[in-house]
Amino acid sequence: QPLQDMANADCIVIEGSNMAECHPVGFQWVVEAKKRGARIIHVDPRYTRTSAFANRHIGIRGGTDVVLLGAVINYLLDNDLYFHDYVVAYTNAPMIISEDYQDTEDLDGLFSGYDPETGKYVTDSWQYVQKPEGASWNVERDETLEHPNSVFQILKRHYARYTPEVVEETCGIAQEDFYYLAESIARNSTPDRTTCFAYALGFTQHTLGAQFIRTAAILQLLTGNVGRPGSGIMALRGHASIQGSTDIPTLFHSLPGYLPMPSVDKQSWPEYVDGIRNES
């Protein structure tokens, strides 16, 4: 979704970014959203111009974002504040995972399938339970979300460890601020209201940066904030021209849509497409 769509949001969470100063042109859409009555929350270790503009600045200990977002997920699940119809219709939450799967709470911090020799996971136990051929869905689903091996229930068990108390101890965030953030997201993630999540390098430049982004994506999917006006996740990059260069793009090695340039060894369209598939 384009940055302009932020103007349609009812709540905007900016985490790990001083958007007001690093993306001054794009920030105009945050200003427009606030004029409409949107709530702006800035989560960042520093107090910056973005913090001054926000309705609330929540200081966080650097590198602990995954704990904060994990606790918000747990809060939404525990209090039935997720967008049920959206989750059932548009996510893999109802799908059933193999009985062989074990989570980190079962294996002392590791998922099933870990190979200590290679340091990688063999993901056979992570697969969906398949339905017989000819069924309307090719995998088993439980739209009540109550099956113990559904993705939804696995998610609930995994994030149960993240509590407001853990957030306070790990992130240095007062419980009052945590509840303000969680309630703001919940109240503005309904059939007629949306929340937008924006991040930049303060969020990603960590050894766990990819996990931070995954957690934000899980949060936005649980609340129905993907594919609707004023929703989504905005990856702001470090400063304005980098985002534009990759989106348009003006970089020498990529085509619009983040497609790689053809190479000399790809002499036909099928070879080019197959090369993209193999690289991804």
Question: Model-derived features: where do they sit?
Answer:
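Short secondary-structure boundary/capping segments
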Residues: Q28-V30, R56-I60, I73-L76, Q211-A216, ...
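Conserved short loop/turn motifs at secondary-structure junctions
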Residues: V166-I173, Y199-T207, L236-A240
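A glycine-rich phosphate-binding loop feature that marks nucleotide/adenosyl-phosphate handling sites
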Residues: A89-P94, S184-I185, A200-G202, G232-Q243
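Long, well-ordered, tryptophan-enriched scaffold segments
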Residues: T48-P191
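Flexible loop/turn segments at secondary-structure boundaries
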Residues: A20-H23, T48-S51, V66, P94-M95, ...
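Active-site-proximal structural scaffolding
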Residues: D5-M6, H23, A33, V43, ...
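Extended redox/cofactor-interaction regions of prokaryotic respiratory oxidoreductases
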Residues: Q1-V25, W29-V30, R36-A38, H42, ...
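Generic, well-ordered alpha-helical scaffold segments in large soluble proteins
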Residues: E15, W29, A33-R36, A71, ...
